[in-house]
From Swiss-Prot:
Gene name for this UniProt entry: sra-11
Organism (species): Caenorhabditis briggsae
Record InterPro entries: 7TM_GPCR_serpentine_rcpt_Sra, Nematode_rcpt-like_serp_alpha
Family, per entry: Belongs to the nematode receptor-like protein sra family.
Topological region Cytoplasmic: 46-60, 128-146, 214-247, 313-343
Name of protein: Serpentine receptor class alpha-11
Major subcellular site: membrane
Recorded topology in the membrane: Multi-pass membrane protein
């Protein structure tokens, strides 16, 4: 970093980082992780679009969350390709290795928007589960509208938040890579990281409560199906109860993973920003390249979504088979009553 309008030459310590084979290997490893995550994101989105085993709004939230991942990973790929290009073709020009922060704004904004977007979409999923639990019969009938409205609102919140983080920052400093956070915006970014951690913790607590409520509702429906084998047994209500429970379990599981991702990202970023001044450029570069958590989260989240969808599908098949058995038992019971009446 440097003062405005003054081009910066890389220091000998900076050149040590660029010439390090370990650092170069770490950059290619980052690219491998990023391209792998993009492949998994595409697979997960395709699975969400083709398998309607969870409600439409939940699928929409998951897709928007994956798009936030892809936004981050696209910017991350551009960032890593820039550094690799510097290493391969510009090491003989040490005074042309730094970037003006303004020229990096789209990459930096995309990295931040991808991270914060995943947090805001987590809020949308939590709100959706609350309303689904409160309005058990009404909410599923709204189909995709809750997803459209809540996703649009959270995207707006995310855009506003990113603008606030970089508010009044002229972006005139020079940075060694486009992943380097502009110094005038670091304070607001760290403040948001603290808020994001509390948000994720609140999501976890709320989802635990919702999961408990859905378990109670499902047990009540089971009790009805066990003691009422007549035509008054509402198969649709029983099925909706099971779907709500399994969807809540799935969202709870995904929220757990996202909470862990947010927690690790927050802790890592705060530690990194605190310790970075005492690190050499090589130590700082290797630490960021190997332990930055978001690329790993963007591999884990689509993988968990695909595993969870498979789990829900299998559970739904079991629930349908169980309900069919219960319906047949009820029909047999009514046939017995009819035979007795005809005698």
């Amino acid at each position: 970093m440097s003062s405005p309008d003054t081009p910066v030459c890389a220091s000998p310590q900076q050149m040590e980082m660029y010439n390090s084979h370990f650092y170069t290997c770490a950059l290619f490893f980052n690219l491998l992780i990023a391209f792998t995550s993009m492949t998994l994101i595409i697979m997960a989105i395709r699975k969400l679009l083709t398998e309607s085993i969870i409600n439409t709004s939940t699928r929409m939230f998951l897709i928007v969350g994956l798009l936030c991942c892809s936004l981050h990973q696209t910017a991350y790929i551009v960032l890593r390709v820039q550094v690799i290009f510097q290493i391969l073709f510009k090491l003989d020009q040490p005074c042309k290795l730094y970037y003006k922060a303004y020229d990096c704004k789209y990459v930096t904004f995309s990295l931040v928007a991808g991270n914060t977007g995943m947090i805001f979409i987590q809020s949308a999923m939590t709100i959706d589960r609350i309303l689904t639990t409160v309005f058990t019969n009404l909410w599923p009938k709204l189909k995709y509208w809750p997803g459209v409205i809540l996703s649009s609102f959270m995207i707006g919140c995310n855009f506003t938040n990113v603008q606030f983080i970089f508010w009044n920052d002229p972006l005139t400093d020079y940075v060694p890579t486009c992943g380097q956070f502009p110094p005038k915006s670091v304070g607001r970014f760290q403040k948001f990281l603290e808020i994001a951690l509390y948000m994720s913790l609140a999501h976890m607590v709320i989802n635990v409560i919702i999961l408990y409520i859905n378990v109670v509702q499902d047990r009540r429906q089971r009790l009805v199906s066990t003691h009422d084998q007549s035509q008054s047994f509402d198969v649709n209500q029983r099925f909706q109860s099971r779907v709500a429970l399994k969807s809540t379990q799935a969202i709870f599981f995904l929220s757990m993973s996202q909470f862990l991702s947010c927690f690790l990202y927050t802790i890592f970023t705060k530690l990194y920003l605190t310790l970075q001044p005492d690190m050499t450029p090589l130590q700082s570069g290797l630490t960021l390249a190997l332990t930055y958590t978001t690329p790993y989260a963007c591999i884990a989240i689509p993988s968990l979504i695909m595993v969870t969808l498979t789990f829900i599908r299998n559970q739904r098949h079991r629930s349908i088979n169980a309900l069919r058995s219960q319906t047949e038992t009820g029909d047999q019971y009514m046939q017995k009553i009819k035979k007795i009446w005809d005698k």
